Structures are given as C-alpha cells and as structure tokens.
Amino acid sequence: MRKITGIIVHCTATHQDWWNGKTTSAKVSEVKKWHTRDRGWSDIGYHFLIDRDGTVAKGRPIERDGAHVSGHNKGTIGVSLFGGQGSSADDNFSDNFTSAQDASLHDLIDRLQSTYGPVPVTGHNEYAAKACPGFRVGAWLADGESEKATGFADIIAAFLSLFRR
C-alpha cells in the first residue's frame, strides 16, 4: 500500500447541468475518456469523483498515484467534484456545488483520514494558478462558508480543522 501524504480537491470544470439525467457512472466514463484519449494518460486522473447528487464514485485505484496535480501526485489522493465551470478560487463552495456534494466531500475526507491519518487537505489552486476547485479548501474546512481565507491562512485553517473533528 502506498503512503498517503495528502488529499487534493478538484472540480471537473463542467457546467452545473452537464449531462443532467445521465448516471454518475456515465459521467465518470466521460471524464476517463478526456484523460485517456485527449491527454494520453493511462487512466482517469482522480481517485474519487462526487456527483451533484452527492454520489461518490471511484476513479483510479487508490493504490496507484493519480494524475491530478503536476509534481504532486505521488502520495496524494485526488478528489473531484462535478461542476465548477466558470468558478473563481475566491468563490464560496455553495456558489458552484450542491449541499449533497458538501456533505459527501466532508464524509469522504473523514473516511480517508480515518484510514490514512490526519493528512492535509488542499485544493488544486494551492499548487497551480488555477481556480480549481472553485473555492478555498482551507476556509471551507475550517468554518464552512463564513470567510474566504487565502494562502498561508488556508494552510493554518486546514491544520486546525483536523483537531475540530
């Protein structure tokens, strides 16, 4: 089993009603096509994907390094939320995602940290000049939607959130 050192949150950058009515499995298959056919990767880049209704789907096997943040895939788990098209890194979670996704993401993080220990949880936007996942993960973890922290404050907030659960 590989050593897990962190969880990195992403978004698929799809419109809120993208493939509305399609199954989560069909959506995951489409993302896998984007990653394998269009980018030439060996598999889908994310380990987990969370649909708009809160359904959590498995992607790449967790035993294998992902393909979700250049230079930071080794030891990390990639989790992607469906949605986020047109988002900003300074948006609130609820600006782009559903309450069902919120609950599922919290639950998945709790389960992963129960298995792998209190590893840091960060957003793609902390490693690259991107909006993804469309909110500040540290602020979301620390106190939901009440403030928008940036940079170092996100890291401190994420660290402190480990002791609040």
Enumerate the language-model features and the residues they cover.
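Basic/polar, cationic surfaces and motifs that engage anionic cell-wall
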Residues: 1-21, 25-26, 52-165
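Charge-rich, low-complexity N-terminal segments
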Residues: 31-32
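Aromatic-lined glycan-binding groove of carbohydrate-active enzymes
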Residues: 39
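Short secondary-structure junction motifs
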Residues: 43-45, 118
